[in-house]
């Protein structure tokens, strides 16, 4: 489903052109992924709502990335722990994120069990800035502890997930295998997401 040619939408340097290509080529695939993830997200036992990026604030420069987010609110996701799946011009990403807009960010992150974080596969990364495609670092104890120390800063962010670079096997495998990789990645993050949204 997701293919190398999907990255070509970012070669259009006009706002209208890139938005049109995103809406026509990528957004429908995001919705298919959302449907495919419904059984996985149902394991959280709370309603999860999808939010396809609209890029409404863009008036001049075309978006440098595009995504679909999943959160516990119909109204939005940036102020809540959420899952984000999307594209930069050179990679496909799957992140569990707590952004700077989140209420009580440090309190939420205090609910996360370190053992569960370190049990994630070695292909996972941690990051500190959703607006920086290069923010991901290997998910090691040292890197994760450094990420947690940053959380005292007002504008700190927290991400766990995976990046799949353009040209990687994800884009040459069968659609079924690709969907399974995405499902497995999200499923691996669910125990931590569950901790973040616990009352």
Swiss-Prot record:
Domain of life according to the entry: Bacteria
InterPro entries hit by this protein: UPF0637 (IPR009403), UPF0637_domain_sf (IPR053707)
One Pfam family, short name: DUF1054
Cysteine pairings via disulfide bonds: none
HAMAP family with a match to the protein in the record: UPF0637 (MF_01851)
Similarity comment: Belongs to the UPF0637 family.
Name of the protein: UPF0637 protein LVIS_1261
Organism field: Levilactobacillus brevis (strain ATCC 367 / BCRC 12310 / CIP 105137 / JCM 1170 / LMG 11437 / NCIMB 947 / NCTC 947) (Lactobacillus brevis)
